[in-house]
Amino acid sequence: GKVLLEGEDITRLSPQQRVSRGMAFVPQTQNVFVSLSVEENLEMGAYLRDDDFSGTMEQVFELFPVLKKKRQQPAGELSGGQRQQVAVGRALMTQPSVLMLDEPTAGVSPIVMDELFERILEVKKTGIAILMVEQNARQALGIADRGFVLVTGENRYTDSGQALLDNEDVRRSFLGG
């Protein structure tokens, strides 16, 4: 197969080339530079940019206000949820057209999980497409335009997020009732 991004085949491109074409990725774990400050982590996200990215950084701080307060603090001293915010913020510094998130709420408290989903919705409202893999299927489908339920690596169900939430088979088999 091949991967198209805005009509361009990016299958064989290097990660840097994919980023320059508009793709950003936030891995599930080890997704911050622990010895760098919050601000330095965000700057790392802008490494391919040759313009003034201060406006983008301010947008990230508006999205995640706690990061502005902790901008000089090493990312390794942050909570799990705050580290996730740094990782998403760093990805947003690339000004992506597609943001890929791998288990963004893994290992965070329910309160932080709700806040992260709210922030993901805010990102979505800016027009950035979001491709998310998430174990918390109910909450992910609740914000999804389109959902895919995979079973042993194969796509079993595809529909709008709400339709999948309303699907009795999906509810019974994957959502606990």
Where are the regions a protein language model picked out?
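ABC ATPase NBD Q-loop/coupling interface
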Residues: 2-20, 161-164
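Catalytic Walker B motif of ABC-type/P-loop ATPase nucleotide-binding domains
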Residues: 99-103
